[in-house]
Design a protein with these regions (language model features):
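Extreme N-terminal, non-catalytic leader segments
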Residues: 2, 9-51
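Phosphate-binding/switch loop-helix module in NTP-utilizing enzymes
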Residues: 123-171, 190
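Walker A/P-loop phosphate-binding motif and the immediately C-terminal alpha-helix
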Residues: 46-82, 198
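Conserved catalytic-core segment of NTP-binding enzymes
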Residues: 29, 154-155, 161-215
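Conserved, well-folded catalytic cores of nucleic-acid-processing
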Residues: 46, 50, 72, 91-95, ...
Length: 215
């Protein structure tokens, strides 16, 4: 399992650790990449769940956080942005497929009332392989935001694939992210990535951050 989780509100450290691509684009150019959400959805906060490598418990953290927020009375949704390796539906006990109406794609709900969209819920068989190149995958991630009827949500958690490839880049460029959760494991190399992010946030003067170490 992971041994630490860092939560940093994105809007407070955007100028400091927003990613390598922000250094090459000004604010106006960045805004031009943002896509409009579903016209019938009202999402108050979008939180990205990220990790430097796979197998550190990122999706487990996503599900646990979603369940905790739901238990507190918040309306929660999960976007499984790991298009080629989706795991959220099975972890949340979802087997039914998505439906569609005049408002968009309707995501199924878990037993806790958490709305979930995932490529597995759109495939005919969940075991079917998704063999697509980066641009196609990135486009699907955007469609999960623009074409899905989320309704009213307090939190939309975006479970991303590990690393800094096409999907995380697309999410940070195209969606109005409010915060991120960085998930790491006991290995020193992985923990180093998160510690660097934490130190950068601290140097940037961010007050809304937390560090948790599990024994």
């Amino acid at each position: 399992m992971y041994n630490c989780v860092i939560i940093i509100w994105y809007e407070l450290f955007e100028s400091n650790i927003g990613g390598f691509w922000r250094k090459m684009m000004n604010a106006d150019v960045k805004k031009s990449f943002l896509v409009n959400g579903n016209a019938f959805s009202d999402i108050k906060r979008i939180i990205g769940i990220v990790s430097g490598k796979g197998g550190v418990g990122k999706s487990t953290v996503t599900c646990a956080l979603a369940r905790r927020l739901a238990s507190m009375g918040y309306k929660v949704g999960i976007m499984d942005a790991d298009i080629t390796g989706p795991s959220i539906p099975r972890m949340m006990g979802i087997a039914e497929r998505c439906e569609e109406n005049d408002k968009g794609i309707v995501p199924p709900c878990s037993a806790e009332g958490i709305k979930i969209i995932s490529m597995n819920l759109l495939l005919k068989n969940e075991d079917d392989a998704v063999i697509w190149r980066g641009p196609v995958i990135a486009n699907w991630v955007k469609q999960f935001y623009t074409d899905v009827y989320w309704g009213e949500l307090d939190f939309l958690l975006v479970d991303m694939p590990p690393g800094t490839g096409d999907v995380p880049l697309t999410v940070f460029q195209s969606l109005p992210i409010d915060g991120i959760v960085l998930v790491t494991s006991p290995q020193s190399l992985v923990s180093m990535i998160v510690k660097k992010a934490y130190n950068m946030a601290a140097n940037g003067g961010s007050d809304e951050r937390s560090y948790r170490r599990n024994s």
